[in-house]
Amino acid sequence: MAIRKLRPVTPASRYLSYPEFDEITKSEPEKSLLAPLKKSGGRNKAGRITSRHRGGGHKRFYRIIDFKRNKDNIPATVAAIEYDPNRSARIALLHYVDGEKRYILAPKGLKVGEQLLSGDKVEVKPGNTMPLKNIPLGTDIHNIEMKAGKGGQIVRSAGAYAVLAAKEGDYATLKLPSGEIRKVRIECRATIGGVGNADHENIVLGKAGRSRWLGVRPQTRGMAMNPVDHPMGGGEGKSKSGGGRKHPKSPWGQLAKGLKTRNKKKASSKLIVRGRKSK
């Protein structure tokens, strides 16, 4: 994927960049795989804000993605590579030989016309899915299950890939994109290759309005608020200390820099060999 930059004819276009979309082969989505997507504006069922800085944005339909890849030993042909407004990765439309159609995350290098397969023992090539126990060590993988049969939950964003580092007993050891080294049950499935659209991280929005199109609202600094609205608010001028401002805090009073918030008794902690911030 190439990134296009504009001539700086306006202040907004000076740094703005956007993808060329040259890998997209189909402009209209498959209607049978669409679902309505209602916006919440960051509110829960009581109408209270539970996720700040959300609201507005362009209307979208949800694309139903097959994260389970449980249609075993039935060949599928890649019919199209499509844009999905709900995620950073591109999606691929598969036509199975029995007539069913499904969307999957488009791996890096996937082309229209290729044949894909999922099952216990299939060819090791980008887009094929199989259990971790049958994947060779050192292979790049994505869309990894945390619980067998539940469907892929991690390593799904654009350009992401994990490396299968080891297998021992009932567990496989993975090196995740964050740097975390983690154990996963060996019967869990993963898809070969990395997720496509790796240049997504290099895109510059360029102007505030483009964030609004994505449904992201402006973010106000705590120091610019009043004391009633934020622990770091108030004071004369740009006060950096006093009145609870000595240590940066979240809007709810929790220390914002360096405080560990993960539950120490969490059961999955024993599966983390090395944390993402460990040296």
From Swiss-Prot:
Biased composition regions of type Gly residues, renumbered to the chain: 232-242
Region called Disordered, residue ranges: 223-279
Function: One of the primary rRNA binding proteins. Required for association of the 30S and 50S subunits to form the 70S ribosome, for tRNA binding and peptide bond formation. It has been suggested to have peptidyltransferase activity; this is somewhat controversial. Makes several contacts with the 16S rRNA in the 70S ribosome.
Species name: Prosthecochloris aestuarii (strain DSM 271 / SK 413)
UniProt keyword annotation of Repeat present: no
Entry similarity comment: Belongs to the universal ribosomal protein uL2 family.
Secretion signal, residue range per the UniProt entry: none
Lineage: superkingdom: Bacteria
Biased composition (Basic residues): 259-279
GO cellular component: large ribosomal subunit
GO biological process terms held by the UniProt record: cytoplasmic translation
GO molecular function, one term: transferase activity
Subunit structure as annotated in this protein's UniProt entry: Part of the 50S ribosomal subunit. Forms a bridge to the 30S subunit in the 70S ribosome.
NCBIfam families: rplB_bact
Ion transport found in the keyword field: no
Keyword annotations from UniProtKB, A to Z: Ribonucleoprotein, Ribosomal protein, RNA-binding, rRNA-binding
Protein name according to UniProt: Large ribosomal subunit protein uL2
InterPro entries referenced in this protein's UniProt entry, alphabetically: NA-bd_OB-fold, Rib_uL2_dom2, Ribosomal_uL2, Ribosomal_uL2_bac/org-type, Ribosomal_uL2_C, Ribosomal_uL2_dom3, Ribosomal_uL2_RNA-bd_dom, Translation_prot_SH3-like_sf
